[in-house]
A protein has these predicted regions:
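Protein kinase-like catalytic core scaffold
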Residues: 1-5
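Active-site "cap" helix and flanking loop/linker of ATP-utilizing ligase/carboxylase catalytic domains
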Residues: 7-58
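Intrinsically disordered, low-complexity acidic/polar segments
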Residues: 13-15, 60, 86, 103
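Short, low-complexity, polar/charged sequence segments that are solvent-exposed and flexible
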Residues: 22-26, 69-73, 96-99, 113-117
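A generic structural signal for well-ordered alpha-helical surface patches
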Residues: 27, 51, 64, 75, ...
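Glycine-rich active-site loop/lid that clamps phosphate-bearing ligands
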Residues: 44-45, 51-85
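Generic C-terminus detector
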Residues: 79-118
Length: 118
């Protein structure tokens, strides 16, 4: 068994649950901590794709290119509010729901190409 990471918190790989599931990882985390029953984690769409938005250089954390990205059907944008960007730094993410992974992936990739920080 190989273990990559243990994270006793919500994790970036589950951010898609904000839009894609009846109950997000964030809500279920709070429910678990409070001893409440967990919510329904089932997806609300047949497919979902989440793409991290990474910085490319040390510059302002201000997102740019949103106008074109948000014109694409179903794109949900999340910015993490970091003041400065850096190469490989996670600055936000986008999520796209769709009828297939391929369709959602295509839209998500197009949207991600439009967004940059600076």
């Amino acid at each position: 068994i190989a273990i990559n990471e243990l994270a006793p918190r919500v994790h970036n790989s589950g951010h898609y649950t904000i839009e894609a599931c009846h109950c997000s990882q964030f809500e279920n985390h709070v429910r678990a901590v409070l001893g409440w029953p967990l919510g329904n984690p089932q997806m609300v769409a047949p497919a979902a794709v989440m793409v991290n938005l990474l910085g490319t250089e040390k510059t302002s954390g201000q997102p740019r290119g949103l106008e074109n990205a948000l014109r694409l059907a179903g794109v949900r944008f999340h910015v993490y509010g970091k003041m400065m960007s850096g190469a490989g730094r996670k600055m936000g993410h986008i999520t796209v729901l769709g009828n297939s992974v391929e369709a959602a992936q295509s839209i998500a990739e197009c949207a991600a190409k439009e967004i940059y920080f600076g």
